[in-house]
């Protein structure tokens, strides 16, 4: 796989102001792209990339300028390819995104409104005005937002600009899940049993669900990305699922039509990437496995799938192409299938856009999908035949989110990235991101930080590289889901390929609790923390004596330092305390012998508390750790993705701990707290109402997802502290019970 590179001149920073309800425009200096060899370039900030082995013909006719109607990582991704092809780029942004990376990377930038997507990125009129003002010849919609909006595609065509995606009729045919099922059936694509029509209200939803037979999947006809979807196992869940999904669909897509189909228990989610042009050519670019999901949203994807043999791959690909040709498809798209344990596959939906997880297909085929979208939109034919599409190695994508994985596998988090270092130095790593150190993760948009991609000669190598990359990924300032990702990639079932869409609840039935360490690993973490503390004390002892001569150094690092250390215990248990002794080998501050429980552990490396990443040797084995917290008597060590608070106290300090009172635990069953920042959509109770345990009290929306908040006990409502439309912070008390 070639790793293409080029250097871009630095672009001067510019502030972009956005007047309320008014379109404003700012043009920046052009950035220069000089590709040193075929492929997609990088700028100096980005390090090495993995995109494509297909070259760029700079003599081929192309667009002069395109506008990217999106934000974040996907806008940056499109800009990179456009620049490599010599195409100028225009970014659009909301007022809060004025200093975002995609704005800085583009040649021009236009502010299209306020932070809420409905007032900016979804404003078709303002995007069209930006196209006219900048003279952009075409628009790439990315994914989400307007990417599957037929009105937008049609309006662009009327305005004389190209939509870098499929024609509006294909979007309409495939975007409506009810209509797309009928087309897929006619195209002889394998189908899931279900009701072929719109579900108008709750009672009818229950009636249809009973006829199909529980469990059923209730989902939005215009949906995607896991939004507007619920699984129901009984009448009660069908009613609630219908109502919540309908509200979510209206909010996310502006279309609340619902459908119901049979839910296939324990399926795999496998999709086929397709690429079509306007000359009747259509290719399938092999499959991606997307079974690791939470709330119907993908967490880790891989390509190819370990479950799909060559003949099945061919059949899935051929059916995907049959469907594409049936609707006159003419761009990149994805046909999604559910696959049962017997390798029967059923059509799920077609995404008429560039898929989030497209990078792993690019890694195994060497085809830059964005490049081909730009070529096809201009009118060129595809450069390959089906026989020329390769399958080289294996690739994984981990979606790194600003989410708390300990809360429902990932409740969104907000904040500013105070420290941010991507692991681009690791072999076979690609990082698709739209943020940088100092960027803000807000409540208005998807909390995706980065798509971390690794490629290897085989599945094992790609997984090992992912493990190393996650260990070296430095993120401070926001809560993130790397602990969950890191635990998954080392978990036995996942590494063997034994996965379904139920993987997360089956492997983590009580929710994600963090990586469980073996006794040997516990001692490794404790020994490392003790060695760090001993080095800190030794250096402090040097400064007690103002004589900086070598003799002082030797004395400080020749002592044996004694501690009592422990890791947090499970609730209701006392932590196991370990007597630890640390000595330095020949006075070397970076070579320590740690005695713990009668076992000696040799640790070497840069034993510094100030490094973002510590790469060390423990008894000759290489491990990577991070120090993510420091306070008196405690060091928080990030090991295998999970933070562990290690208590490291001098012996004399331990005796005083018995006099320290523990904090009284707060009874949280009497209050309903906001689990994250967001907006209140529904309040279902008022003061004085009697409620039962588990009853829905409040519905809130954050980062385009609706969350139902329930009573923690049976009782009377004492106070309701919020109203519909209110914006709340994490931990805010919404409802109080007596």
UniProtKB/Swiss-Prot annotation:
Cofactors demanded by this protein: biotin; Mg(2+); Mn(2+)
Q: Which residues form the Biotinyl-binding domain?
A: 663-738
Question: Describe its PTM?
Answer: The biotin cofactor is covalently attached to the C-terminal biotinyl-binding domain and is required for the catalytic activity.
Residues the entry annotates as binding biotin: 409
Pathway of action: Metabolic intermediate metabolism; propanoyl-CoA degradation; succinyl-CoA from propanoyl-CoA: step 1/3
| Highest taxon of the lineage | Eukaryota
Q: Its quaternary structure?
A: The holoenzyme is a dodecamer composed of 6 alpha subunits and 6 beta subunits. Interacts with sir-2.2.
Q: Which organism is it from?
A: Caenorhabditis briggsae
* Residues at which Mg(2+) 2 binds: 349, 351
An example GO CC term for this entry is: mitochondrial matrix
What EC number(s) does its UniProt record assign? 6.4.1.3
Instruction: Name the active site residues.
Output: 353
From the Swiss-Prot or TrEMBL record, give the protein name: Propionyl-CoA carboxylase alpha chain, mitochondrial
- PTM sites of type N6-biotinyllysine: 704
PANTHER family, A to Z: CARBOXYLASE:PYRUVATE/ACETYL-COA/PROPIONYL-COA CARBOXYLASE, METHYLCROTONOYL-COA CARBOXYLASE SUBUNIT ALPHA, MITOCHONDRIAL-RELATED
The record's annotation in Gene3D superfamilies points to: 2.40.50.100, 3.30.700.30, 3.40.50.20, ATP-grasp fold, A domain, ATP-grasp fold, B domain
Q: Known catalysed reaction(s)?
A: propanoyl-CoA + hydrogencarbonate + ATP = (S)-methylmalonyl-CoA + ADP + phosphate + H(+); butanoyl-CoA + hydrogencarbonate + ATP = (2S)-ethylmalonyl-CoA + ADP + phosphate + H(+)
Q: How many and how are cofactors bound here?
A: Binds 2 magnesium or manganese ions per subunit.
- Please list the residue ranges annotated as the Biotin carboxylation domain: 62-509
Q: What is its main location?
A: mitochondrion
Which keywords, in A-to-Z order, does the entry hold?
ATP-binding, Biotin, Ligase, Lipid degradation, Lipid metabolism, Magnesium, Manganese, Metal-binding, Mitochondrion, Nucleotide-binding, Transit peptide
Purpose: This is one of the 2 subunits of the biotin-dependent propionyl-CoA carboxylase (PCC), a mitochondrial enzyme involved in the catabolism of odd chain fatty acids, branched-chain amino acids isoleucine, threonine, methionine, and valine and other metabolites. Propionyl-CoA carboxylase catalyzes the carboxylation of propionyl-CoA/propanoyl-CoA to D-methylmalonyl-CoA/(S)-methylmalonyl-CoA.
Task: Work out whether the entry's keyword set contains Lipid metabolism.
Answer: yes
CDD domains recorded: biotinyl_domain
Which positions in this protein are listed as binding Mn(2+) 1? Answer: 336, 349
């Amino acid at each position: 796989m070639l790793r293409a590179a080029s250097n871009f001149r630095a672009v001067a920073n510019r502030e972009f102001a956005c007047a309320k309800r008014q379109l404003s425009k700012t043009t920046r200096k052009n950035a220069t792209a000089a590709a040193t060899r075929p492929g997609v370039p990088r700028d100096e900030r980005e390090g090495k990339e993995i995109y494509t082995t297909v070259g760029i013909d700079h003599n081929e006719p192309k667009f002069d300028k395109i506008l990217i109607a999106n934000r974040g990582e996907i806008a940056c991704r499109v800009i990179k390819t456009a620049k490599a092809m010599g195409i100028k780029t225009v970014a659009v942004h909301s007022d809060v995104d004025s200093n975002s990376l995609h704005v800085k990377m583009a040649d021009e930038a236009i502010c299209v409104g306020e932070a809420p997507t409905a007032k900016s990125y979804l404003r078709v009129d303002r995007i069209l005005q930006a196209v006219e003002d900048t003279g952009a010849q075409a628009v790439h919609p990315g994914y989400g937002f307007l990417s599957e909006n037929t009105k937008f595609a049609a309006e662009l065509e009327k305005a004389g600009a190209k939509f870098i995606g499929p024609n509006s009729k294909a979007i309409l045919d495939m975007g409506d899940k009810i209509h797309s099922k009928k087309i897929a059936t006619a195209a002889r694509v394998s189908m899931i049993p279900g009701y072929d029509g719109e579900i108008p209200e709750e009672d009818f939803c229950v009636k249809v669900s009973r006829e199909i037979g529980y469990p059923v999947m209730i989902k939005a006809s215009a949906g995607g990305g896991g939004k507007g979807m619920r699984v129901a196992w009984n009448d009660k869940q069908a009613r609630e699922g219908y109502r919540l999904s309908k509200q979510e669909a209206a909010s996310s897509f502006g279309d609340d039509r619902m459908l119901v189909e049979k839910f296939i228990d324990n399926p795999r989610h496998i999709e086929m990437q397709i690429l079509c042009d306007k000359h009747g050519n259509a290719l399938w670019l092999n499959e991606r496995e997307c079974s690791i999901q939470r709330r119907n949203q993908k967490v880790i994807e891989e390509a190819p799938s370990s479950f799909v043999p060559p003949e099945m791959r061919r059949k899935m690909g051929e059916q995907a192409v049959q469907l594409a040709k049936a609707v006159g498809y003419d761009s990149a798209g994805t046909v999604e299938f559910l696959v049962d344990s017997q390798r029967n596959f059923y059509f799920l939906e077609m995404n008429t856009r560039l898929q989030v997880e497209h990078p792993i297909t690019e890694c195994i085929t060497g085809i830059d999908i964005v490049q081909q979208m730009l070529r096809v939109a201009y009118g060129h034919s595809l450069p390959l035949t089906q026989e020329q599409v390769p399958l080289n190695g294996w690739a994984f994508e981990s979606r790194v989110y600003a989410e708390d994985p300990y809360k429902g596998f990932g409740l969104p988090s907000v904040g500013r990235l105070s420290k941010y270092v991507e692991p681009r130095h690791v072999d076979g790593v690609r990082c698709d991101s739209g943020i940088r150190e100092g960027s803000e993760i807000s409540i208005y948009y998807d909390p995706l930080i980065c798509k971390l991609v690794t490629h290897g000669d085989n599945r094992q190598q790609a997984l090992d590289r992912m493990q190393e990359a996650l260990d070296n990924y430095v993120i401070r300032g926001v809560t993130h889901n790397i602990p969950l990702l890191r635990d998954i990639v080392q978990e036995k079932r996942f590494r063997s390929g034994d996965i379904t869409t139920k993987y997360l609840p089956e492997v983590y039935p009580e929710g994600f609790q963090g990586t469980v360490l073996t006794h040997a690993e516990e001692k490794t973490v404790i020994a490392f923390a003790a060695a760090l503390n001993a080095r800190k004390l030794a250096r402090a002892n040097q400064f007690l004596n103002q004589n900086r001569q070598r003799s002082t150094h030797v004395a400080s690092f020749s002592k044996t330092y004694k501690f009592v250390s422990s890791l947090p215990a499970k609730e209701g248990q006392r932590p196991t305390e370990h007597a630890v002794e640390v000595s330095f080998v020949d006075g070397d501050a970076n070579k320590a012998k740690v005695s713990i429980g009668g076992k000696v552990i040799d640790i070497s490396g840069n034993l510094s508390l100030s490094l973002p990443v510590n790469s060390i040797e423990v008894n000759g084995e290489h491990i990577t750790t991070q120090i993510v917290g420091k306070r008196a008597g405690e060091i928080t060590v990030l090991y295998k993705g999970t933070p562990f608070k290690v208590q490291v106290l001098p012996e004399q300090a331990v005796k005083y701990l018995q006099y320290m009172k523990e904090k009284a635990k707060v009874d949280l069953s009497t209050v309903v707290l906001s689990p994250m920042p967001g907006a209140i959509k529904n309040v279902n109770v008022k003061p004085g109402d009697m409620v039962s345990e588990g009853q829905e009290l409040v519905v809130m929306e954050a980062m385009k997802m609706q969350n139902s908040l329930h009573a923690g006990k049976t009782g009377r409502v004492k106070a309701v502290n919020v109203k519909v439309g209110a914006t709340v912070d994490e931990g805010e008390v919404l409802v109080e019970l007596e």
